[in-house]
Every structure is written in structure tokens, then in C-alpha cells.
């Protein structure tokens, strides 16, 4: 059994055991190691060089899996590759009413460029606020209903539209330093949401209530971001292990375990 598959794990993806530097192909399927069949399939925004998404053996020192995906996409003109769950995957309809924990390891290289790479997602849910019937004063009808984004200042942004709400909620992380691996976690206990970076709670967590996540039963994307219902941006950088759990977990349960040096394999 995999230690990273804890109680309530809905999806767990890792990217090790591949030839580093080789591109992904349309035949590659990222298996969901939780056993829930929420596998990821490759999507390409044409025209794209097939080398815009590659396997890598780079990883955060405390990451369970010893590998990652290296994305080299751009916005103008939009090109690149991303992954998504299949239509009908169980996790597409999950509303996380009892809480959630989303975790991802990520890395931004110093070649990251705000003009080309800002407002991309580590992961996001397809479907816009407007399509979900959300029209509050602070709602942006074109925004995706769930996204963990990288802003123009390289800040993490968890921007979501909770259930029974006509407006979204936002958690902000700090500016991400280049050329270093980070662990991001967003934890909701059914009513409040907190973001953590490398196990520490960020300063800008909102006080407003947030219950569950709106869904239009569409796929989740890894590395893709929609705006106005169309693909708008693709990630630039690297993404390591990603885990989604349908409950709030404590920082001690995070995949980020600084007490473990993964090079020992323990």
C-alpha cells in the first residue's frame, strides 16, 4: 500500500518511474493511485511542440514520489500541454461538503515570465461561475469555479466558488521564490479555508465562511486554466505529487514531511 493514500483520498497522482527528459505522449495515462479511477489523460492545445510537457526526476526533497512533470507552455500565442480527468470521472462531481485538502508540490524556474506565464493554474475545475448560475456583486462570471493559480506576482491564489454562495472566496500565498520546490496545501473543514506553504499557514487567509465546492460535473485540469469557458492559459514550471482528500487534514498528515529525507527512501 502507498503511505500517501490516507483516509478519504479521492485522487493521488505522482509522476515518477519514467525516463527523465522524455516527452509525454497521447498514450500516457497518469493512474490515480487512490484506487478511485480518477486517472489523468493528456490534452494538447494545437499547435504545440510535443516537447512542451516532459517527465522529470526533479522533486521536492520531502515529496513521496521521486519525479515531476515539467511544463513549458506560453500564453501569446497560447500553446502547451496539460492533463485532465476523463469525462465522467467520479471526482468531477465531488462537492466536498464535509471539507477537503488539496496538496501539490510545485517549482517555478527563473525563466518564468509574467507576460507569458501569469494566471496559470496548478489545478482547476472546468466550468465558469456564470455557467454555475453565480452572479454575486464580487463574482466574475468568466472565472473558473475552482482554481489554484499563480498570479502575475507569482503568488499562490486559491479562488473558489463555494456551495450556496453567490460570490467567491480567495486565499493568497506569498510571492513564490524561483528555482526552489514548494509544497502548497489548501484545507477546508466544512466552513473555513486555510492555505499552507511548506507546512506553515499563510498570512492572508479569509475569515469568511466557505462550504464545499461548486461543480458542473466537468473534468479537473492539471496545468490548464479556463476563462470564459475556454482554455486561457497553461502552466509553466514543474508539478510534483498532487493529492486530493475529502476532509480537512492536519499539517502533520501533509505529504510535506520535513522530518523525512526522501533520499533514504523512508
Q: What do these predicted regions represent?
A:
Residues 205-238:
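Flexible glycan-contacting loops in extracellular carbohydrate-active proteins
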Residues 1, 10-20, 101-110, 232-261:
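Extracellular, beta-strand-rich glycan-interacting domains
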Residues 120-159:
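Glycan-recognition/cleft segments
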Residues 156-183:
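Short, aromatic/His-centered strand-loop micro-motif at the edge of beta-sheets
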Residues 180-194:
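Localized edge beta-strand/strand-to-loop motifs within extracellular or lumenal beta-rich domains
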Residues 1-4, 42, 70-100, 168-175:
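Short surface loop/edge beta-strand patches of beta-sandwich-type extracellular domains
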Residues 1-80, 133-142, 210-211, 254-266:
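Extracytoplasmic low-complexity segments
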Residues 15-22, 107-113, 128-129, 162-164, ...:
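Acidic glycine-/aspartate-rich tracts in secreted/extracellular proteins
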